[in-house]
């Protein structure tokens, strides 16, 4: 035969997502769609959503790592928003970066202004020295 006709049909290669090609967990396709629909620029290049997804994944990993370190090793509790919020405020760089960000269900940070604290009197100082 001359090679015409049906030979073993070509199988289609399994599709790979852009996230798996980049080695990311965050969805590159969704980030690309949001960049296009958000009117941030007239055109969006192919590398921009990959880079943005990688940055978002890195920041998320850093935040979760800080919150995870805050948990005691003995307990098997989940990472909650108040713990995440406290961990962010204790970290200097992330606090500077995310200073104006509100975390849902994060609670409030314990902070008492020095003006509101009780004043130390002379009698309390003298009783402690005796």
UniProtKB/Swiss-Prot annotation:
Sequence positions bearing N-acetylserine: 2
PTM sites of type N6-succinyllysine: 10, 96
PTM annotation (N6-glutaryllysine): residues: 96, 119
Primary location group: nucleus
Keywords recorded for this protein, A-Z: Acetylation, Chromosome, DNA-binding, Hydroxylation, Isopeptide bond, Methylation, Nucleosome core, Nucleus, Phosphoprotein, Ubl conjugation
Post-translational modification: Monoubiquitination of Lys-120 (H2AK119Ub) gives a specific tag for epigenetic transcriptional repression. Following DNA double-strand breaks (DSBs), it is ubiquitinated through 'Lys-63' linkage of ubiquitin moieties, leading to the recruitment of repair proteins to sites of DNA damage. H2AK119Ub and ionizing radiation-induced 'Lys-63'-linked ubiquitination are distinct events. Phosphorylation on Ser-2 is enhanced during mitosis. Phosphorylation on Ser-2 directly represses transcription.
N6-(2-hydroxyisobutyryl)lysine: residues bearing it: 6, 10, 37, 76, 96, 119
Keyword Acetylation recorded: yes
Chain positions with N6-lactoyllysine modification: 10
Region annotation Disordered: where it falls in the sequence: 1-22
Record carries keyword DNA-binding: yes
Cross-link Glycyl lysine isopeptide (Lys-Gly) (interchain with G-Cter in ubiquitin) mapped to chain: 14, 16, 120
GO molecular function: DNA binding; protein heterodimerization activity; structural constituent of chromatin
Residues recorded with modification Phosphoserine: 2
Recorded GO CC terms: nucleosome; nucleus
Coiled coil (UniProt feature): none
Sites of N5-methylglutamine modification: 105
Record's function text: Core component of nucleosome. Nucleosomes wrap and compact DNA into chromatin, limiting DNA accessibility to the cellular machineries which require DNA as a template. Histones thereby play a central role in transcription regulation, DNA repair, DNA replication and chromosomal stability. DNA accessibility is regulated via a complex set of post-translational modifications of histones, also called histone code, and nucleosome remodeling.
Subunit structure: The nucleosome is a histone octamer containing two molecules each of H2A, H2B, H3 and H4 assembled in one H3-H4 heterotetramer and two H2A-H2B heterodimers. The octamer wraps approximately 147 bp of DNA.
Family indicated by similarity: Belongs to the histone H2A family.
Protein name, per record: Histone H2A type 2
Species in which this protein is naturally found: Xenopus laevis
């Amino acid at each position: 035969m001359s090679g015409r006709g049906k030979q073993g049909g070509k199988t289609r290669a399994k599709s790979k997502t852009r996230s798996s090609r980049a080695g990311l967990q965050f969805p590159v396709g969704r980030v690309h769609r949001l960049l296009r629909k958000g009117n941030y620029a007239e055109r969006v290049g192919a590398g921009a959503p990959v880079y943005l997804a990688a940055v978002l994944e890195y920041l998320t990993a850093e935040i979760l790592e800080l919150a995870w370190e805050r948990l005691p090793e003995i307990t098997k509790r989940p990472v909650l928003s108040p713990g995440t919020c406290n961990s962010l405020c204790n970290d200097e760089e992330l606090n500077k970066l995310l200073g104006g960000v509100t975390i849902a269900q994060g609670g409030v940070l314990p902070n008492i202004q020095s003006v509101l604290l009780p004043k130390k009197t002379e009698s309390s100082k003298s009783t402690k020295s005796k």
